[in-house]
Regions:
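A short, Trp-centered hydrophobic/proline-enriched beta-strand micro-motif
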Residues: 129-144
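A structural signal for short hydrophobic beta-strand segments in well-ordered beta-sheet cores
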Residues: 161-162
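C-terminal helix-coil-helix/basic helical segment that borders enzyme active sites and/or dimer interfaces
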Residues: 29-41, 284, 288-295, 311-347, ...
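Glycine-rich phosphate/cofactor-binding loops in nucleotide/flavin-utilizing enzymes
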Residues: 82, 363-413
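A short core secondary-structure module
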Residues: 171-215
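Internal helix-loop-helix
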Residues: 55-132, 179-185, 328, 332, ...
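Amphipathic, small/basic residue-rich leader segments at the start of a protein or domain
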Residues: 1-97, 120, 401-413
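Glycine-rich beta->alpha junctions and the first turn(s) of the following alpha-helix
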Residues: 5-16, 215-315, 384, 406, ...
Length: 413
């Protein structure tokens, strides 16, 4: 099938879309099901199999500024185009793209980093084809509340960093961390003042892999999204130089985030469009081939109408994601609706669940068989409803923005 384009895409964007699609088709899809089905979840991680290929074609470093050796692509729309094609290959591998965007966002936030930090870590990232980064926020009793965020002293990060001279001594535990144990640099949110909430008492540290006192716990055995490894990180008197702190001490999560150019939510949303597109295309081809009652499935109204809804859902979600991405890219020229990024992400995630479920129904009994990818698409879609804060917290965030516009404030129960 032809790739989705519109009249506003540049030749460069069409070319990188085609590149990402070819990588997904030739490199990701042939191994996705095998990795997904691995008995040990640690063996499902995509980077040992695909990391060097992503580096060869330039996708791993596309977000890194040119002055540090990267591709210098900084517009969100192009990242969403790539995210959709990689998501069409497999939802889990999109974390490779997010690693590139995240280290760029952190390092290029001049209020948080120094020139020396940027030179050191961006250069290291570009030179090492297996260099990935991880963000460590979630803990056993601190997850979704960090999104709004909850600012009470009884919540938020419980991982502590106590200053001792030129070092912080870090103790605590993180969980659900993407790429943990493989990534070479970790952006870790810690509590540096336990008498205050995370808006006044939290800080952000960079901790390289191999730092004494840092170890890794169990690999989480997930329902879906299995090609992206998630694992626990354990800090036991981990000694981190003060120079590895980003921004001032106790800068707080809200102020830290205010300096980070957003967009990862929309890249994730674009990946969900790619996932749904894969499920729709599989169902369409199956409906064209399989016969029941003397005619092809697609000729039965119940199936044909379901495919119409799936087609409409995928294209509507893509249009919404693209509109939101372009709004961010052109924020100096057009008014920015702060609700649109979150709303587009919500729509794309819920759409992917509908479309993958409908694809399962069209395949019937064959849909639940593990030799076909349809059940994997469904698992991946529903797994992502509980990622990055979960769908309910995303809705609460958009609701809070609606309330703010109405002159009200969202209140926690």
């Amino acid at each position: 099938m032809s790739l989705p384009i519109d009249g506003f895409m540049t030749e460069e964007q069409i070319a990188i879309q085609q590149l990402a699609h070819e990588v997904a088709e030739k490199e990701i899809r042939p191994i996705a099901m095998k990795l997904d089905h691995a008995a040990d979840p640690a063996d499902s991680y995509f980077m040992p199999h695909l990391g060097k290929k992503f580096d060869e074609v330039g996708l791993r470093t596309m977000s890194i500024p040119e002055e540090y050796g990267g591709g210098g692509i900084d517009d969100l729309f192009t990242h969403c185009i790539v995210g959709e094609e990689l998501g069409w290959g497999d939802r889990g591998v999109v974390n490779m793209l997010l690693s590139s965007t995240k280290i760029t966002r952190f390092m290029m936030a001049e209020k948080l980093t120094t020139l020396e930090q940027r030179k050191k870590w961006l250069t290291a990232y570009v030179k090492d084809p297996e260099f990935q980064i991880s963000t460590a926020s979630t803990e056993d009793n601190s997850g979704s509340e960090n999104m709004l965020p909850y600012n009470g002293t009884d919540g938020g990060y419980q991982t502590t960093a106590v200053r001792e001279g030129d070092y912080y001594i870090v103790n605590g535990r993180k969980r659900f961390i993407s790429g943990a144990g493989y990534s070479k640099l970790y952006f870790v949110y810690v509590r540096t003042d336990k008498t205050k909430g995370i808006n006044e008492g939290a800080s952000l540290l960079m901790i390289p892999i191999g730092t004494p006192g840092m170890s890794f716990g169990r690999v989480h055995d997930k329902m879906g999204y299995r090609l992206n490894l998630n694992r626990e990180i354990i800090f036991d008197n981990c000694k981190v130089p003060v120079e590895n702190r980003l921004g001032p001490e106790n800068y707080g999560i809200t102020r830290i985030r205010s300096h980070l150019r957003g967009g990862d939510g929309l890249i994730n949303a674009a990946a969900m469009v790619g996932l749904a597109r894969a499920a729709y295309e599989a169902a369409l081809e199956y409906a064209k081939e399989r016969k029941q009652s003397g005619k092809k499935l697609i000729q039965h109204q119940a199936i044909g109408l379901k495919l119409v809804d799936m087609y409409s859902d995928v294209n509507a979600a893509r249009a919404y994601v693209w509109q939101a991405a372009r709004m961010v890219d052109h924020r100096d020229k057009v008014p920015v609706d702060p609700k649109m990024q979150g709303s587009a992400s919500l729509y794309a995630h819920e759409m992917a669940c509908r479309v993958t479920r409908d694809a399962m129904e069209i395949f019937g009994g064959s849909g639940v068989m593990r030799e076909l990818p349809v059940e994997m698409y469904l698992r991946n879609a529903y797994n992502m409803m509980h990622s990055d804060g979960g769908i309910i917290m995303k809705k609460l965030k958009v609701m809070g923005q609606l309330n703010s516009e109405a002159g009200a404030n969202i209140k926690r129960d």
